[in-house]
Amino acid sequence: MPNFYTDSPELKHYLSHPLMKRIVALRERDFAEKDQYAYAPHDHENAMDNYERVLEIVGEICGDIIAPNAESVDHEGATCRDGHVYYASGTEQNLDALRKAGLMGMSMPRRYGGLNFPCVAFMLAADMVSRADASFENLWALQDCAETIYEFGREEQKAHYISRVCRGATMSMDLTEPDAGSDLQSAQLKATYDEAAGCWRLNGVKRFITNGDSDIHLVLARSEEGTKDGRGLSMFIYDKRDGGVTVRRIEHKMGIKGSPTCELVYNNARAELCGERRLGLIKYVMALMNGARLGIAAQAVGISQAAYEEAVAYARTRRQFGKPIIEMAPVADMVAGIKAKLDATRAILYQTARYVDI
């Protein structure tokens, strides 16, 4: 089977950019952890070799497991039974393979069990996973939600939740509601503090939540009584193991059916405040969505790569007038146009990732 990394020289090209010298030094803090962790690099060349080796593993899993499962995953889809989501069997295989390979929490610090990868390397992995199965990318890349806990959570929250993500726990960001889509400041899911239990309680409905039955949720909720704008919203962490959230239904979609898009009902669900009150939308969601936008860009590039390969394969095998249609100028022009746009968008993606790292 193909290795999506070693068979794609254009990906290796982006990892060898001159700015990687500076990016690695910043990410590794001048290799301060070289004596603390056995797998921490001791110099630039060692770090680059680590990235290469891990990306080769990602490429192998994509070629051997995720891509072959993609069609059956889309046919089978995720299902909802008794208020919970059950992934397609192929999705479970994909998750199991990446968990065993230690590819959850790739960008998280080593002290929590992560690989401490820079954004460029993580986007290279996301590019390949998206090419193999766009629906699985929706699930796997949500590990990046852990960045919000890392940036704004308390130290005990980081140690508890991020370490679980690095061991394979799934995540979701529960933002939109029936009457609050793009207009997130209208969100009404209610958060009230339970003095007796010493925790927050969440009540209400969330809709169109990707991977809505995940292990760990970041939830946008209204914590300030009487407010109507974004300044009354806070960010909370909900742990599925505490119960209190039911999946009412999975949305029917035209594609990416392996990724469950859920409607959730919160019924007095126990939650923890992440960061400070009132900053849920105006600070934390804004930071969260910046990372999400980059992930969706990587997904778009991966899908484009898969579409380009399908177009080339078809144009080479489909024959008309005694020759493959790729030899006809109009078709060759279309294929060349696809490739040009693909290369341009990929260049923008990795240039943006470099800016994020620096």
Ranges and model annotations:
Residues 293-358:
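Extended amphipathic alpha-helical segments enriched in small hydrophobics
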Residues 241-244, 248, 253, 260-292, ...:
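A glycine-rich, basic-preceded beta-loop-alpha segment at the flavin cofactor/substrate interface
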Residues 179-182, 208-211, 227, 253-260:
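Short Gly/Pro-enriched turn/cap motifs at secondary-structure boundaries
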Residues 76-86, 109-115, 143-152, 175-180, ...:
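Conserved short loop/turn motifs at secondary-structure junctions
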Residues 199, 203-245:
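A short core secondary-structure module
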Residues 1-136, 156, 160:
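Amphipathic, small/basic residue-rich leader segments at the start of a protein or domain
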Residues 81-96, 100-108, 172-201, 205-216:
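Flexible, glycine/threonine-enriched loop-and-boundary segments that flank and lead into catalytic domains
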Residues 141-142, 153-189, 198, 353, ...:
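Internal maturation/activation junctions in enzymes
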